[in-house]
């Protein structure tokens, strides 16, 4: 039995879960999410909780059991609280600003980097060097943060670049000159 898969998912107040096989829809105060559920698992929706069970003990069913439960839980959390990822920009002259649906980044290139934000994602900029990527879909929030970081990943010598707020960069010693 999957230790994660057998846990029930509590439904907070204001969140509605609708399951019409194979699609599950979750609606809440922050928005709506829908996802297709794979084969091998059964979903039982009550007023207070959602439980995920598997039909049999095949490898496919066992692997889908915990995954399905976690995906549904992320949907419920997303429409009730939302998700956010914090990014930091380090470097002289490196900065960010948001204009409408476009994130403008100055990252030391000869040109500014303009990144169009996906639908449902908002970015707040604090002090031009701290970014907060927010949204209701955990996958899209993480993917957007990873794409922003990929424009200029942190380098190991001075630490310049875009990094996650909780990320530690292994620093290297520079060259030592001959004497």
Swiss-Prot record:
Q: Note the SUPFAM superfamilies from the entry.
A: Ribosomal protein L6
Annotated membrane-spanning segments are none
Q: Which residues form a coiled coil?
A: none
Instruction: Note whether rRNA-binding occurs among the keywords.
Output: yes
| One GO term of the biological process aspect | cytoplasmic translation
InterPro entries, per the entry: Ribosomal_uL6-like, Ribosomal_uL6-like_a/b-dom_sf, Ribosomal_uL6_a/b-dom, Ribosomal_uL6_bac-type, Ribosomal_uL6_CS
Which Gene Ontology molecular function entries are recorded, alphabetically? rRNA binding; structural constituent of ribosome
Alphabetically list the UniProt keywords: Ribonucleoprotein, Ribosomal protein, RNA-binding, rRNA-binding
What GO cellular-component annotations does this UniProt entry give?
cytosolic large ribosomal subunit
Q: Which family does it belong to?
A: Belongs to the universal ribosomal protein uL6 family.
Q: What is its biological role?
A: This protein binds to the 23S rRNA, and is important in its secondary structure. It is located near the subunit interface in the base of the L7/L12 stalk, and near the tRNA binding site of the peptidyltransferase center.
Q: How does it assemble?
A: Part of the 50S ribosomal subunit.
Query: What is the protein name for this chain?
Result: Large ribosomal subunit protein uL6
């Amino acid at each position: 039995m999957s230790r994660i898969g057998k846990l029930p998912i509590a439904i907070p107040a204001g969140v509605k879960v609708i399951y019409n096989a194979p699609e599950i829809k979750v609606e809440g105060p922050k928005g709506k999410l829908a996802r297709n559920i794979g084969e091998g698992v059964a979903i039982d929706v009550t007023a207070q909780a959602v439980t995920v069970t598997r039909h049999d003990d095949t490898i496919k069913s066992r692997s889908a059991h915990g995954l399905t439960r976690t995906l549904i839980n992320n949907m419920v959390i997303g429409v009730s609280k939302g998700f956010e990822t914090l990014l930091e920009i380090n470097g002289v002259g490196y900065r960010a600003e948001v204009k409408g649906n476009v994130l403008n980044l100055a990252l030391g290139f000869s040109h500014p980097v303009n990144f169009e934000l996906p639908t449902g994602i908002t970015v707040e900029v604090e002090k031009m060097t701290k970014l907060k990527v927010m949204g209701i879909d955990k996958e899209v929030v993480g993917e957007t943060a990873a794409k922003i970081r990929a424009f200029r990943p942190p380098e190991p010598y001075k630490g310049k670049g875009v990094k996650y707020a909780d990320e530690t960069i292994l620093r290297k010693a520079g060259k030592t000159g001959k004497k």
